[in-house]
């Protein structure tokens, strides 16, 4: 059969494999491409192709990530797989590879292990909306009761992290046997992908979300007023619409009287556009880099929050020494540095942590000296003297 022309007429969804080391994430990823390739919906990627992922840099942090794409009858998927545990932590916290959902791989031979838990917690903290469980290596377990016990254990674990443990699909698979072409295990990969199609919700497109643009620069045009430039992160803004300026000072409303892109006037700007917005009744000194323009009421300014943070190792250009609660770095949020204080660190089990070492993945409570437009899932960097020493994501807003 001729390979069907690859067309982007299906909804696009970003997913990834997560789970404990050696539970078969990469093998399963290879198995998905092998099985779908037989229907002309993927190109075969073998273990070595995926495992030899090139290094990428995201916000000054080096991350190894493999990107694989394939499609099902219903959707087009971009799938990320990371070779090492630290790569997952960095990837999920920086948002380098945005995930709309994830396949949690757990070996039936081992059951949930330390990183199984850590990845579920990370998925919760960074806002991965949905999970599907692939119970891998089921060909190696003869006793159906053992498989049932492992499934129960995973469901309880998911529920303990506020995922709907009773409802999440758990599919018994064998990545290795599927690659070897055994029909019953190939069928299980199809079953897994059906579950992914059905259980991982289609993401809302950026353009359909409420308008937000982080201000990068401000200048005044004589006789016309003040222009704020930046890249529209999401939504659409039309000439004549009211927007709100949020962050650093008290929020205030203004009307967009013009949208410019590449020196041309437009009726509207949309997600992804780099634009200049002409604002009515605003002086150049009223607004500055670090503020955002938003659909009124869609986002609020805050100073206190909790975040999940990865602290860079010395080899990654991070600090050489640990730091403690009370540490005052800069938080780089969207387009600007804001000074803040880290008031507390919390371990995975909820206990207080005194000292944080380079290379740690930790929950922290932070307080900024001035309010910034903030929401759950927002990414930030922690810097000192212009150098990135950590990456984080807002997991909770306090005030």
Swiss-Prot record:
Per the record, its GO cellular-component terms are:
cytosol
**What is this enzyme's catalytic activity, as reactions?**
GTP + H2O = GDP + phosphate + H(+)
Q: Where is the tr-type G domain?
A: 10-204
Cellular localization per UniProt? Cytoplasm
Where are the residues of the annotated region G2? 60-64
The record ties this protein, via SUPFAM superfamilies, to: EF-Tu/eEF-1alpha/eIF2-gamma C-terminal domain, P-loop containing nucleoside triphosphate hydrolases, Translation proteins
Top-level lineage group: Bacteria
Record's keyword annotation contains Ribonucleoprotein:
no
Question: What InterPro entries does its record include?
Answer: EF-Tu_GTP-bd, EF-Tu_GTPase, EFTu-like_2, EFTU_2, G_TR_CS, P-loop_NTPase, Small_GTP-bd, T_Tr_GTP-bd_dom
Alphabetically ordered keywords of this record? Cytoplasm, Elongation factor, GTP-binding, Hydrolase, Magnesium, Metal-binding, Nucleotide-binding, Protein biosynthesis
Q: Spell out the residue ranges making up region: G1.
A: 19-26
**Which segments carry the region annotation G5?**
174-176
Molecular-function GO terms, alphabetical:
GTP binding; GTPase activity; translation elongation factor activity
Positions of GTP binding: 19-26, 81-85, 136-139
Question: Region labeled G4 — which residues?
Answer: 136-139
Record-linked HAMAP family: EF_Tu_B
Q: Subunit composition?
A: Monomer.
Q: In which family does this protein belong, per the annotation? A: Belongs to the TRAFAC class translation factor GTPase superfamily. Classic translation factor GTPase family. EF-Tu/EF-1A subfamily.
Q: What does this protein do?
A: GTP hydrolase that promotes the GTP-dependent binding of aminoacyl-tRNA to the A-site of ribosomes during protein biosynthesis.
The name on file for this protein is Elongation factor Tu
| Species of origin | Synechococcus sp. (strain CC9902)
